[in-house]
């Protein structure tokens, strides 16, 4: 028979994260949501208890926890507010796991290690104003010039766009090839202060305390070493990243499904 009980380590993890969220996040989230204010210290607080590196191997600065443990962490963050779960979902699920799967060893040392250590925050830029999340129809381009590329285009509805240090973005290296012409690039905000710009999307209906924004790229010059995978691998990488990220979203739904019957009972009583 399949044993679905949590291990003692997993139970301790849940208790630790639950207590942390109650102490650090719960007291201010209501006011921040009403005001549309994003606390820029969220990631630093998550890093203070090692959550950004939860499921990455220790050789990359992580803690080597299993994927179920990541789901449990996300459930506890979600219980307080989706803002906190989203930060970790994007950082680990969309970007970190993508790098762990597709990046070279040098790239992992360059990007994944500081991410897992909680030193750098990452975001994921796929959606566009005129294409949505239809990768084949994206308009952002990466024009090759020798050993470099010039990236131009816009990404929207990007979680942590304004606060992220690293940005995983997708652009067409072959605009005529549909989804087969998309490539993936990792940008370090510090290297592109003059050509990379981000802006918050304000007065949103939901996730008002989150950092959600747009990315604007104007002749952002990157090298071949900044490309993840080969040219044309962008679609596969994007879908792989989304698979990992959606796991944490599913845990969000599981958490709400377990919580709402209790709330309904409290209301009826």
Indicate where each model-derived feature is located.
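Glycine-rich beta->alpha junctions and the first turn(s) of the following alpha-helix
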Residues: 2-13, 197-269
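Internal helix-loop-helix
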Residues: 48-119, 159-166, 178
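Short Ser/Thr-interspersed hydrophobic loop/turn segments at strand-loop and sheet-helix junctions
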Residues: 50, 74-78, 171, 187-194, ...
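Short Gly/Pro-enriched turn/cap motifs at secondary-structure boundaries
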Residues: 115, 130-133, 157-160, 174-176, ...
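A short, Trp-centered hydrophobic/proline-enriched beta-strand micro-motif
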Residues: 118-126
């Amino acid at each position: 028979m399949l044993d679905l009980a949590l291990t003692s380590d997993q139970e301790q993890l849940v208790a630790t994260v639950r207590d942390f969220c109650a102490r650090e996040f719960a007291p201010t989230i209501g006011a921040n949501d009403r005001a549309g204010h994003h606390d820029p210290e969220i990631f630093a607080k998550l890093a203070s208890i090692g959550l950004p590196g939860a499921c990455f191997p220790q050789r990359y600065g992580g803690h080597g926890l299993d994927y179920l443990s990541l789901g449990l962490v996300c459930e506890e963050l979600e219980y307080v507010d989706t803002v906190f779960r989203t930060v970790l979902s994007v950082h680990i699920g969309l970007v970190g796991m993508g790098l762990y799967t597709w990046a070279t060893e040098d790239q992992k040392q360059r990007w994944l290690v500081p991410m897992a250590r909680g030193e750098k925050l990452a975001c994921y830029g796929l959606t566009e104003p005129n294409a949505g999340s239809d990768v084949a129809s994206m308009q952002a381009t990466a024009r090759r010039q020798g050993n470099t590329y010039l990236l131009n285009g816009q990404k929207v509805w990007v979680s942590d766009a304004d606060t992220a240090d690293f940005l995983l973005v997708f652009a067409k290296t072959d605009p005529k090839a549909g989804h087969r012409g998309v490539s993936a690039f990792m940008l370090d905000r510090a290297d592109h202060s003059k050509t990379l710009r981000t802006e918050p999307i304000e007065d949103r209906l939901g996730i008002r305390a989150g950092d959600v924004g747009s990315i604007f790229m104007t002749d952002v010059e990157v090298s071949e070493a900044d490309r993840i995978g080969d040219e044309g691998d962008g679609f596969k990488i994007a879908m792989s990243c989304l698979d990992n990220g959606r796991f944490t979203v599913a845990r969000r739904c599981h958490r709400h499904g377990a919580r709402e019957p209790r709330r309904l009972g409290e209301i009826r009583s």
